[in-house]
């Protein structure tokens, strides 16, 4: 079989692979994407669809998230993919949660965050989804965006193929990458640059590296309702006070220790399963609820009903929506490194292996792609 060539070959059509394809194609490169499944089916479609800059630490990571946000808006508008540029609310229902939100609202603007503390009445005016009897106040941020990951992962490839001539090879596993050659079951390709965005597949390509990389898999459980009646609109994306302990940006708050201590003492099962609560709304009108976090190399395929019940139970303390009936339940798995925001491995010149963005894949992918392709130029 004859060998073919391309400028930039990308292995994996999840959001990280698509982000690299977009940045490379925009710069005039001939781009070819290889995906072993009929469509992307990993972590990229099994998440909230939240672009969440406020969760990233001040400085390089927040700046990268904002660069990524700019690229997201560019491609969403160009591809005519629906999105909700609504910002977010971290809803506080206890004094410990409010203390963190208020402290971050004081510190955040000096570090570049577009955020403010809202009183109870201001929170209720901003969101129809918050129970008046429950809320103390909320941390407002204007930078968060909601997309439907299923829609995005379907429409971006169509747009890239049509607008930039990006070639997609679906059902096409890559068996090896060596000396800028990509060997598939169909043929061998030669590329100037190869970017491997393998997600949680640590076994197929470069298994020796992954075995000593420190990467783990994180398993999360999520749910989605059907479309809400009468086009009910969530407004800003919602996070509960438990979320303050999850994102690294909030570690600058001294008051976080008291909240962590309260949760450890009063809600230890939420720590055991790494549960915090968030709500996003897809373009279909359905609400996505989650999520939990369990770490290891071999995540179980079996959902725990108690985890879903705990997520819903906590949401019930502050969330009011017209129809909370669950239409879908699933689990997702993403790759994460315990210390690094992501892992980049360069087995040889012109080959980059990138994974391990953890829960920030949607938020950071386009920014990471910019860094990769600047570094490779």
Write out the residue ranges for each language-model feature:
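Beta1/beta-strand and adjacent pyrophosphate-binding region of the FAD-binding site
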Residues: 2-14, 32
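Short hydrophobic core segments
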Residues: 9-11, 174, 182, 189-201, ...
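Glycine-rich FAD pyrophosphate-binding loop
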Residues: 25-45
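Dinucleotide-binding Rossmann-like beta1-alpha1 core, especially the glycine-rich loop
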Residues: 48-126
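Short beta-strand to alpha-helix junction loop
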Residues: 63-64, 91-100, 139-158, 301-307, ...
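Helical element adjacent to the flavin cofactor pocket in flavoenzyme catalytic cores
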Residues: 138-180, 189-193
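Central helical "cap/lid" subdomain
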Residues: 188-255
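C-terminal catalytic lobe of FAD-dependent flavoproteins
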Residues: 273-276, 282-288, 294-377
């Amino acid at each position: 079989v004859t060998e073919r060539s391309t400028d930039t070959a990308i292995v994996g059509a999840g959001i990280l692979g698509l982000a690299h394809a977009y940045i490379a194609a925009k710069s005039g490169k001939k781009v070819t994407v290889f995906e072993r499944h009929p469509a992307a089916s990993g972590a990229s479609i099994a998440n909230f669809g939240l672009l969440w800059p406020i969760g990233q630490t001040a400085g390089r990571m927040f700046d990268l998230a904002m660069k990524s946000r700019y690229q997201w808006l560019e491609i969403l508008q160009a591809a005519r993919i629906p999105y909700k540029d609504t910002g977010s609310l971290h809803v506080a229902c206890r004094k410990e949660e409010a203390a963190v939100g208020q402290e971050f609202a004081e510190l955040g603007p000096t570090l570049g965050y577009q955020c403010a503390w809202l009183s109870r009445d201001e929170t209720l005016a901003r969101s129809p989804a918050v129970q008046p009897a429950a809320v103390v106040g909320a941390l407002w941020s204007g930078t968060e965006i909601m997309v439907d990951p299923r829609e995005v992962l379907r429409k971006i490839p169509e747009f890239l193929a049509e607008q930039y001539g990006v070639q997609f090879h679906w059902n096409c596993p890559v068996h090896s990458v060596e000396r800028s050659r990509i060997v598939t079951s169909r043929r061998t390709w030669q590329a100037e640059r190869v970017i491997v965005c393998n997600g949680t597949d640590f076994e197929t390509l470069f298994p020796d590296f992954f075995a000593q990389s420190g990467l783990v898999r994180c398993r999360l459980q999520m749910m989605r309702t059907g479309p809400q009646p009468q086009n009910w609109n969530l407004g800003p994306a919602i996070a509960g006070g438990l979320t303050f302990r999850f994102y690294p940006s909030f570690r600058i708050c001294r008051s976080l220790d008291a909240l962590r201590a309260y949760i450890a003492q009063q809600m230890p099962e939420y720590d055991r399963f790494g549960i915090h609560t968030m709500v996003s709304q897809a373009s279909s009108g359905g609400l996505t609820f989650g999520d939990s976090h369990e770490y290891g190399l071999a995540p179980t395929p079996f959902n725990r009903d108690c985890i879903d019940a705990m997520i819903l139970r906590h949401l019930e303390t502050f969330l009011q929506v017209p129809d909370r009936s669950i239409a879908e339940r699933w689990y997702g798995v993403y790759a994460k490194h315990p210390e690094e925001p992501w892992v980049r491995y360069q087995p040889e010149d012109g080959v980059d292996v990138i994974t391990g963005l953890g829960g920030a894949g949607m938020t950071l992918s386009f920014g990471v792609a910019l860094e990769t392709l600047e570094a490779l130029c």
